[in-house]
């Protein structure tokens, strides 16, 4: 079982590397780690388990956050209609994104960042993702709103980008016009 001790923190070189694609068939280790990443997210959202194991609540995690510079991630997040998006995705790529932008009202956080970083992180409100499941089956997934923000945050990790890289340095509270704000 993964715990917070397994997650590398900002400053670790794996968080700034561009991760390499996995090849199929996946190794047993890659499959196991993907499943453990999803299990971590599920456990972190369970109040009792989170307290028992000292887990910070998370909705997404990428392999580089575990010092594994390979292109896979897990998300476990509900949208505003309580629809669950629960996936382990290998070699995810953003196929298309909306012109309409969105952000979270309270900014973003990260399991690898142990401090609050104020500021808006403006992202696409909708994205279409191409990816593979653990068996190498191609997937085409659409995300909107909060789940779209989460998946973009995790794909950024695969490209060595941290959420705060997107924050306006001169004015962190600057919000461009016509950005939809969630939360």
UniProtKB/Swiss-Prot annotation:
InterPro entries, sorted: Peptide_deformylase, Peptide_deformylase_sf
Cofactor note: Binds 1 Fe(2+) ion.
Catalytic residues, chain numbering: 154
Keyword terms, alphabetized: Hydrolase, Iron, Metal-binding, Protein biosynthesis
One term of GO molecular function: peptide deformylase activity
Binding-site list for Fe cation: 110, 153, 157
Cofactor (UniProt): Fe(2+)
GO biological process: co-translational protein modification; translation
Record field: catalytic activity: N-terminal N-formyl-L-methionyl-[peptide] + H2O = N-terminal L-methionyl-[peptide] + formate
EC code(s) of this entry: 3.5.1.88
Highest taxon above the source species: Bacteria
Any Pfam family matching the protein: Pep_deformylase
Record's keyword annotation contains Transcription: no
Family the UniProt entry places it in: Belongs to the polypeptide deformylase family.
HAMAP family in the record: Pep_deformylase
NCBIfam families for this protein: pept_deformyl
Function: Removes the formyl group from the N-terminal Met of newly synthesized proteins. Requires at least a dipeptide for an efficient rate of reaction. N-terminal L-methionine is a prerequisite for activity but the enzyme has broad specificity at other positions.
Protein name: Peptide deformylase
Originating organism: Listeria monocytogenes serotype 4b (strain CLIP80459)
């Amino acid at each position: 079982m993964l715990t917070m001790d397994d997650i590398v923190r900002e400053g670790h070189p794996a968080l700034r590397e561009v991760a390499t694609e996995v090849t199929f068939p996946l190794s047993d280790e890659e499959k196991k780690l993907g499943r453990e990443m999803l299990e971590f997210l599920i456990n972190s959202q369970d109040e009792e388990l989170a307290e028992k194991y000292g887990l910070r609540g998370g909705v997404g995690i990428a392999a580089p956050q575990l010092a594994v510079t390979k292109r896979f991630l897990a998300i476990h997040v509900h949208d505003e209609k309580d629809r669950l998006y629960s996936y382990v995705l290998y070699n995810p790529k953003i196929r298309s994104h909306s012109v309409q932008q969105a952000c979270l009202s309270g900014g973003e956080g990260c399991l690898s960042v142990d401090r609050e970083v104020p500021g808006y992180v403006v992202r696409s409100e909708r994205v279409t993702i191409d990816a593979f499941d653990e068996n190498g089956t191609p997937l085409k997934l659409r995300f909107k709103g909060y789940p779209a923000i989460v998946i973009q945050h995790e794909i950024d990790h695969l490209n060595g980008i941290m959420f705060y890289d997107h924050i306006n340095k001169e004015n962190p509270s600057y919000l461009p016009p016509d950005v939809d704000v969630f939360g």
